């Protein structure tokens, strides 16, 4: 338990139906008692937790009523932080909330830092670090599938997997260290070393299995950046509007209408996809259009995937080939548009000979080909993987790097065992693997890492 009491506004700024001041710490009830005047509940602080009390927030210095409020009490350890927690629920205006917060701080609370309530939940053992990070992922989830991935981590799915791996690794370590400390009693036969190496190989395979879903998990968490590119007037903005199901971008018959990158997020088969509608790629003397073309090149460089749109009505031109060359090296989907105007205008096999990626046919204005396009994008990311209630996916780059590091240490430890190297070498690698896995769940995380993680939270969480 930490020794001071913290407070902050726990609801978003601005006007709303309800605004909440959250107080957590050993003096939460004492401080709230100086601010809150209940109606008909004289001993509310001595009552049971998980109850709400009606009354008024007042300034104890002047006796002035600040707001009409409901106060909820959650007693330690059955609270979010495992400390005494009081929440003052008032009206959601900026002024009353700030006045109540100032009074609470004047009565002895300290203003909470970013994520400090969740940090206390971690330090007090209610959450591990994976679950603490998942709290932020739940808040930021943009699709139902993204939410399910975050909730799976919040429920402890990944933590259980990592915990089981660490426990198995600790057992291997204990056996090897016993043979080092007591060589006359615990001399490890070669067959046993092979068995221990097999256990390390199984744990290494567990790391690989989790890492196989890392790219899909990252997309669920951070979104997939898809740059829509092509020469002018091939239907890029029409495609953006069709995928958004709204007229977001201006569409005309005049080439070069789009001068800048337009970014919008859409839900494609559960994936949050950031669509980047770009300026048409062509040689031009127009200064503004040239700036737009430069930004298009930057968008392609920064995108996770490139969607090249071709115009069947104009055939496959040199400009199209230059666009395809620009997208080389990126995950790529080619969409041959306007097949309603020229069904045989572009031979898809000729395009397939130029690119490494799916080539689809579409008539965007008529809505043809959109379902196949969405399925293709999702398929490239998920690779047939189905997410559900019990899916465990690595969605955090920090977790991914730690797992990769743990896998390398496990491989080195296994190699040390089977090659006859001193057992102390294997012990060093096993301990390093344990530290890498512990960084994920927080057992071995240092203050610098915690500061970096919780700095991304809002102050009231």
UniProtKB/Swiss-Prot annotation:
Q: Where does K(+) bind?
A: 233, 252, 254, 257
Q: Which cofactor does it need?
A: K(+)
Q: Which residues bind Mg(2+)?
A: 237, 258
The record ties this protein, via InterPro entries, to: G_TrmE (IPR031168), GTP-bd (IPR006073), GTP-bd_TrmE_N (IPR018948), GTPase_MnmE (IPR004520), MnmE_dom2 (IPR027368), MnmE_helical (IPR025867), P-loop_NTPase (IPR027417), Small_GTP-bd (IPR005225)
GO CC, sorted alphabetically, is: cytosol
- Its main localization is cytoplasm
The residue stretches assigned to a coiled coil in this entry are none
Q: Which residues does the record give as GTP binding sites? A: 233-238, 252-258, 277-280
GO MF terms here are: GTP binding; GTPase activity; metal ion binding
| Entry note: cofactor | Binds 1 potassium ion per subunit.
TrmE-type G domain sequence ranges: 223-382
Which compartment or compartments is the protein found in?
Answer: Cytoplasm
Which parts of the sequence bind (6S)-5-formyl-5,6,7,8-tetrahydrofolate? 22, 87, 126, 461
The UniProt entry's GO biological process terms, in alphabetical order, are:
tRNA methylation; tRNA wobble uridine modification
Alphabetically sorted, this entry's keywords are:
Cytoplasm, GTP-binding, Hydrolase, Magnesium, Metal-binding, Nucleotide-binding, Potassium, tRNA processing
Q: Which NCBIfam families match?
A: mnmE_trmE_thdF, PRK05291.1-3, small_GTP
By sequence similarity, the record places it as follows: Belongs to the TRAFAC class TrmE-Era-EngA-EngB-Septin-like GTPase superfamily. TrmE GTPase family.
Per UniProt, subunit arrangement is: Homodimer. Heterotetramer of two MnmE and two MnmG subunits.
List the PANTHER family: TRNA MODIFICATION GTPASE GTPBP3 (PTHR42714), TRNA MODIFICATION GTPASE GTPBP3, MITOCHONDRIAL (PTHR42714:SF2)
Give a short account of what the protein does. Answer: Exhibits a very high intrinsic GTPase hydrolysis rate. Involved in the addition of a carboxymethylaminomethyl (cmnm) group at the wobble position (U34) of certain tRNAs, forming tRNA-cmnm(5)s(2)U34.
In Swiss-Prot or TrEMBL terms, this protein is called tRNA modification GTPase MnmE
